């Protein structure tokens, strides 16, 4: 680095440390504003640097016409780059010199600027956006003339008569240099629906969208992509009324609808306007799928160039960049390549993990970007339309969003910055809390935006709260009116009837004689766990019930991160990724091991075990029943039951030693419970990379003594991997690790149902049975002892008669024949010796109508003198049917023999009436009865339009074309793209030969 730059840097640090730098009174840009021309060169002296600037004529700014844009370099500094924006005498600039970045910004004081060096640091992982399945290859669009898909906008789109020439009007040919595209222009239309305006406000939403898209521009201009791409906002649509475009809950239908909307807007543009290359539709509504959805490779087309994104705060910029990349043709990382970069959170990873300080494009994305860029013919030149150009620099935002506004944007209504927890720096991470629960703070693990106010005359710069230019650190002046907290009120009653619940208390903030909700620092309410006084009876697992309500095959899933323990997470029995269904109800235990920790508004409130609670204090004196069992099982080719663990078992440990690889499964002893295979919920680990010793359980040692043997040779040295996993079943969390020779299954909390352990060989083609050893150890609470009770042992002899009344002898046995009572007799079999048929109630009819309905009843042979009123008495006194007469009462009779109503039935849609072009498809109606009069009046058949491929035209096939097409890119289009684009006359003119060849192939296909 030259010596003059060192001097400049030294002076720079001195200026930054001393405060703001005041430029000369004369304008920094030498040419007055009204006399600027694109070919003129401007010089700006900045400390020891000489900035050579040139106005960028291609940049248009209809929304902020008072701004002008310049680009250039620092003289005598190789590889330098400068971007400067002037808005009413205020300068915003980004300087890249010697591998470092410097930001030039105005202060709040007029005619004062500050220059800062950016030291970008890496932040922690951000919130996750799972975008798996966020793409579609083709869309099913049907453009009917009577469709009304253009709702009235308060930022009106431009309309004109329909013209097919507008999309290719004044299109200049562009030949891509061999070294790559030198510059790309991606012109965008941004649509914000009524949910965006309702949340952000009509005036504020414009600034918010520009700030959001500035972040997107910075992502695309990151050095890891090497794109040299410029984003231009060509059109901004704001809809105040609820639109009819989005199909809420069906993201694919919504994507098809907005692409149809986009097509109609492009077709209605005035002649001479090229429109835009892609459209971003922003909404805060639930999409019913990923946070974004886009057609792959749809840019530069009219029918597939729109993407939909859900606004979840400024971090949604990474989702927008992700979907824009899909429109450009980029695919997900990890789909065959760049798996490691996807796991680190690249922009095109299926699960996006990124922050404003930590994002990068993978090598696969970079390779795809530059390989596909030659096909983006619409991006090779800037149009003549007006638009807001986004430079991609990471300078501080021009529009200041306070921390409260950022919290509301990220988490929703009612959220503001958390004030109940003291943090070292408010700029290191954005913490937010809801006004109903101010003591519970949440974060998406990202810092506030650059330039966010963090105190009086202070703002956030590189995650540090620093004084604004022109201000130094000020000491706080003692205020006579200091807000003060009042005393805490009494705790509320425990909200649980049994077990553990929650109680709350509040305090009020007093300021200037009034009660204030925000003047005092700290929390105005507290929540704590409480003991209701008695344990609850055996209850069901609420997590299992909630997952079962969503789908019968779902079981609970417990995240490794404790901060997510109060979320309803479920996973399929057959494995796969967990799905989140919101927060658990208040009062639900946070985990299975600590039932005294209780969930409240999605956050776990820690508690303590009550000494009288038998759920957690189940072994108070240390004397518990320890159960140890060993088994040897012979395995065949099917599932074999290894053992059955009873409910109420705690501290469970199972060890299975096997000579062959096994599949292990768990099954609750309940009806209709599917088998849970451990292999479907396991992860593979490389043993050679692990340095842990493995626990070898000795079944002869009671587990409650917690004695284990450390043995590093328990695994066969030939094995190179093992499997680990966990799952929730039988109301407890089970963990396991498995190799080809050993399986360990453990659980600490109580089993709510009996649990069956089963095994099957991995390769079930055994000729001989294989012997497998299993040891099971668990503990149960010691039952209460009862006082000794001594009773006589009574024996009854046989009855002297089988019916009609008899007697039998009763004798008593006692110890050593002492104090034995004398024998006695009792009557027996007093029922009559005559038996009759008794009938039960008629059952329900087998049909509600028709000619086949029958109903049945059950017959019993019972004594004639028995008085029985219930079915239970019939069964108790019934005897063999041979004791009754052969003439039985009827046990079956016809019922509901009435005609059934019949209705007209719709048949499947008929094929299209035309083999090509437009036609009609109908849905016939049939009457299932023999006479159509029984079905009533025949309703009108439903009809719909259908359209197949365009009918081939002999005139088009025979059309005369020049020797070569006018445009070099015609040969790059696929056959499907040619079928669509050749409908536009200007395109057919430029690509005459390509369109004629496509018509001939289609003519041969249909001919």
Curated annotation (Swiss-Prot):
**Positions of the Peptidase M12B domain:** 184-370
**Signal peptide bounds:** 1-20
Q: Name one GO biological process term.
A: proteolysis
Q: Which residues are glycosylated?
A: 130, 228, 561, 610, 626, 737, 777, 865
Molecular function terms, GO-annotated: metalloendopeptidase activity; zinc ion binding
What S-S linkages are listed for this chain? 338-364, 494-530, 498-536, 509-520, 912-946, 916-951, 927-935
Where Zn(2+) is bound, by residue? 322, 326, 332
This entry carries the following GO cellular component terms, namely: extracellular matrix; extracellular region
Q: Where is this motif: Metal-binding?
A: 322-333
Q: How is the cofactor bound?
A: Binds 1 zinc ion per subunit.
Q: Which residues form the active site?
A: 323
Give the induction note.
Expression is strongly induced in hemocytes during pupal ecdysis, and at a lower level during 4th ecdysis and pupal stage. Induced by 20-hydroxyecdysone in a concentration-dependent manner in the cultured wing imaginal disks, but not in fat bodies, of day 5 fifth larval instar.
UniProt keyword list: Disulfide bond, Extracellular matrix, Glycoprotein, Hydrolase, Metal-binding, Metalloprotease, Protease, Repeat, Secreted, Signal, Zinc
**PANTHER family, from UniProt?**
A DISINTEGRIN AND METALLOPROTEINASE WITH THROMBOSPONDIN MOTIFS 2-LIKE PROTEIN, ADAMTS A DISINTEGRIN AND METALLOPROTEASE WITH THROMBOSPONDIN MOTIFS PROTEASE
Q: What does this protein do?
A: Involved in larval molting and metamorphosis. May degrade extracellular matrix (ECM) and basement membrane (BM) during the development of organs to allow degeneration and remodeling of tissues.
Q: What is this protein called?
A: A disintegrin and metalloproteinase with thrombospondin motifs 1
Question: Source species, please?
Answer: Bombyx mori
| Gene this protein is translated from | ADAMTS-1
